[in-house]
Every structure is written in structure tokens, then in C-alpha cells.
Swiss-Prot record:
Binding site for Na(+): G79, S82
Lineage: Bacteria, Bacillati, Actinomycetota, Actinomycetes, Bifidobacteriales
Reactions this protein catalyses: fluoride(in) = fluoride(out)
Record protein name field: Fluoride-specific ion channel FluC 1
Gene Ontology terms for molecular function: fluoride channel activity; metal ion binding
Record has Disulfide bond as a keyword: no
Protein purpose: Fluoride-specific ion channel. Important for reducing fluoride concentration in the cell, thus reducing its toxicity.
GO biological process: cellular detoxification of fluoride
Length: 131
């Protein structure tokens, strides 16, 4: 079981890299003229990971999925996919650039968006499988 969690963690990290590069390319192309340096990709990735974690945990709670599957997906894949340490580093980077308002807003969003997404995941799972 442990090796499966590790394997899924590696797959999650690769998926994060692909999504991160894709979002950054599109975001940088759109904002090249305005010079906006908002770390959108990390926020999106953590939101998606939290949404999926909410769905997975509520699916386990409603006994639609077994614990081994949840462990491989949530701890493995989503553990490799999400990147809250990068989000905190981006807040520190914005502070060092003296972009205090953006750092504060991004710091709040880094906590609020995943919480909202995990709650939405709970709701989606409940709608899909009412108890």
C-alpha cells in the first residue's frame, strides 16, 4: 500500500507541474503588458486539490469508496499535486517585493479558496450520493 501512495504522489507532482506550466503560460501571455505578477497557478492548483479532497472524503464517509482508495488518492496523488508550501513562499516573495496589499490578499485567498473548495467538494459528493 505504501508504494502505491508514493507512486500516486509522484503522479500528482507531475500533474501539478503540467498544470502549473500551462496556467503560467496563459496568464503571463495575458498579463505581459500590465506586468501583473499574481501567482494564479498555485491558487488554482490548491483549489482543485481541495475540491477533489472534499469529494473523496465525503465519498468515503458515505461508504462509496474504501479507505485504501482514499489514501492513495488524497494522501498520494493530491499530496503530490497540492503545494501549500509554494503558496507561502509566494506570499513571502510578494512581501519582499513590497507588494503588501497583494501579499495580504493572496495570503487570505490561499486559506479561503481551499476551504471553500473543500466545502464545495463535500456538497458535490452529497449531491452525487445522498445518504
Amino acid at each position: 500500500m505504501m508504494w502505491m501512495i508514493c507512486l500516486f504522489g509522484g503522479l500528482g507532482a507531475m500533474a501539478r507541474y503540467v498544470l502549473d506550466v500551462s496556467i503560467q503560460r496563459g496568464w503571463n501571455r495575458e498579463n505581459r503588458r500590465t506586468n501583473r505578477n499574481f501567482p494564479l497557478s498555485t491558487l488554482v492548483i490548491n483549489g482543485v486539490a481541495s475540491l477533489c479532497a472534499g469529494i473523496a472524503m465525503m465519498s468515503y464517509y458515505s461508504q462509496s469508496v474504501d479507505m485504501d482508495t482514499v489514501m492513495m488518492f488524497v494522501v498520494g496523488f493530491l499530496g503530490g499535486f497540492s503545494t501549500f508550501s509554494t503558496a507561502l513562499n509566494e506570499v513571502v516573495s510578494l512581501i519582499r517585493q513590497r507588494r503588501f496589499t497583494l501579499a495580504l490578499g493572496y495570503g487570505i485567498a490561499t486559506v479561503a479558496v481551499p476551504l471553500i473548495c473543500v466545502a464545495a467538494g463535500f456538497g458535490i459528493a452529497l449531491l452525487a450520493n445522498p445518504a
